[in-house]
């Protein structure tokens, strides 16, 4: 199971070039693709996919905030829909999902935690944190960086708490979107 991540040329304030060949995949893109893939594999019974390769396309059309975390959340919905289609066609005996997964970005701006920072907030952030969690509340991915100065454990706890709340809301939205698929 893998994911391909790409930002369309006008997804950012200034146009960026396309990454056309696999050899041209830049470090940031490769890192994001690996993160998305790890998150999806963490909630999938890979033995239940025996004989199948699943590739999820994550195309960013507007990059104003946490694109990698938005891709994790959306990629899970796409995966669930694809697996439900395979089960519905008789190609899978059951849907091999163990749980849901969603992700958010959290930042520290002016000493305060912010959820899902926009570009301007991200540019001012003292700390950048990406969090991915299962629907059962288990951590899949925690990536964090202090931009200029170290930060206290209390600030990390506040960001993790805010991130958890955001992920719980996204998980509910995923469940609503996938309600008719009978994923059990």
What is each PLM-predicted segment?
Residues 1-3, 50-54, 100-102:
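A generic structural signal for short beta-strands and their flanking turns/coil linkers
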Residues 3-5, 56-58, 106, 131:
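Preference for bulky hydrophobic residues occupying beta-strand positions
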